[in-house]
């Protein structure tokens, strides 16, 4: 422990030091941070459902009926009626035969990958995959081969070099720091052609992409035959906490018996599970909310273009590149001074020299909010 102070000083000197900012209000388009009311442009609550009255009442009813905690792992005493209801809702919403809930999206990816991949498995993983996929690959006993981001030629070259007897292609559906989409139809074709299994993390696509918010499969017109393993989270557009995997019943049966993060973790609380189920139901019943989010994304990218910033706008995640860490820190502080909260993203979340402001659009943002954020962003960047 003698080097703790020195390590912290090194972090500060590299402009990588992080501190916690405290929100004293719910996640909405406006929040109070450290005592100041600002526009929120960095939340993953894409549909703004964290304040939805029906969803909150569902959580309260579950709390009153089932108590504050599950009291054990799902395989011992922690499997309650709300957990089974959630998995049924997930399977119906995602169009899969079955589903299995985890305590987080992180543990879902780690559990699924480490359970399915053995010593003879080759995993082909996109270079910009989320840390939970990277850590799941590290836990797995197979060989991990990283291919260049969304580069099908590089992926094919690596597959042809190795010719694995059993292999997985694993990718984010929406890449969390860049906001671009995986080339899923091409990945599905490659997986079929070479006898590989395609796994997609739909954390930032569920409730966001597709005509009804069912994710990347709906967006691209694919099925679970094309993508047999779909993971995701319950803490973004779905306004709760937890994670999931959707697939065949036999897949979920195997994971119930072999996925260590599922077996050795206390089950999610009944209130959180009930909130997730209610959130899924609300999204399914209100596709107009998903369209509103998609319309806001299109409007915001247009507003940014008017301010001289051209971004793809494939998803609600809008990265504005700053480059050096110090510049990103100054830009984020300048933006906050103008009433817009969008923290900078730095190493190790992104590579060194690729620091950025990561803005996210919500369905609850107004056009005035979006215009104000675009103008404020131009001013903040001009000052650094």
UniProtKB/Swiss-Prot annotation:
Q: Which cysteines are joined by disulfide bonds?
A: none
Q: Which residue spans traverse the membrane?
A: none
Pathway the protein contributes to: Cofactor biosynthesis; biotin biosynthesis
Q: Where does pyridoxal 5'-phosphate bind?
A: 105-106, 176, 201-204, 233-236
User: Gene3D superfamilies, from UniProt?
Assistant: Aspartate Aminotransferase, domain 1, Type I PLP-dependent aspartate aminotransferase-like (Major domain)
On this chain, the residues bearing N6-(pyridoxal phosphate)lysine are 236
A GO BP annotation: biotin biosynthetic process
Recorded hits in SUPFAM superfamilies, A to Z, give:
PLP-dependent transferases
Self-association and partners: Homodimer.
This chain belongs to the protein called Putative 8-amino-7-oxononanoate synthase
């Amino acid at each position: 422990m003698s080097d703790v102070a020195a390590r912290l000083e090194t972090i500060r000197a590299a402009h990588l030091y992080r501190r916690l900012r405290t929100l004293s209000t719910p996640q909405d388009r406006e929040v109070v941070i450290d005592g100041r009311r600002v526009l929120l442009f960095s939340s993953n609550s894409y549909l703004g459902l964290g304040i939805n009255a029906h969803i909150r009442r569902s959580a309260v009813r579950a709390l009153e009926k089932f108590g504050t905690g599950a009291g054990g792992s799902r395989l011992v005493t922690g499997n309650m009626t709300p957990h089974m209801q959630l998995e049924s809702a997930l399977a119906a919403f995602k169009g899969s035969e079955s589903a299995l809930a985890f305590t987080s999206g992180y543990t879902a990816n780690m559990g699924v990958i480490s359970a399915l991949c053995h010593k003879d498995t080759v995993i082909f993983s996109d270079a910009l995959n989320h840390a939970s996929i990277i850590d799941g690959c590290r836990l797995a006993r197979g060989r991990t081969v990283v291919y260049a981001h969304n580069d099908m030629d590089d992926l094919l070259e690596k597959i042809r070099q190795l010719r694995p007897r059993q292999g997985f292609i694993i990718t984010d559906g929406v890449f969390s720091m860049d906001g671009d989409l995986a080339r899923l139809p091409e990945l599905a074709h490659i997986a079929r052609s070479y006898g590989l299994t395609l796994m997609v993390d739909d954390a930032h696509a569920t409730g966001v992409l597709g005509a009804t918010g069912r994710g990347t499969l709906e967006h691209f017109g694919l099925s679970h035959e094309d993508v047999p393993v779909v993971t995701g989270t319950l803490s973004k557009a779905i306004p709760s906490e937890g994670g999931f995997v959707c697939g065949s019943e036999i897949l979920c049966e195997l994971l119930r018996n072999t996925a260590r993060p599922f077996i050795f973790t206390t089950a999610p609380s009944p209130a959180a599970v009930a909130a997730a189920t209610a959130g899924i139901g609300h999204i399914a019943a209100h596709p107009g909310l998903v369209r509103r989010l998609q319309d806001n994304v299109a409007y915001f990218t247009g507003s940014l273009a008017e301010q001289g910033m051209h971004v793809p706008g494939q998803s609600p995640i809008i990265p504005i590149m700053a480059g050096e860490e110090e510049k990103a820190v100054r830009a984020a502080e300048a933006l906050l001074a103008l009433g817009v909260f969008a923290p900078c993203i730095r190493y190790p979340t992104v590579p060194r020299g690729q620091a950025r402001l990561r803005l996210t659009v919500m369905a609850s943002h107004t056009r005035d909010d979006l215009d104000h954020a675009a103008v404020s962003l131009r001013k903040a960047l001009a000052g650094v």
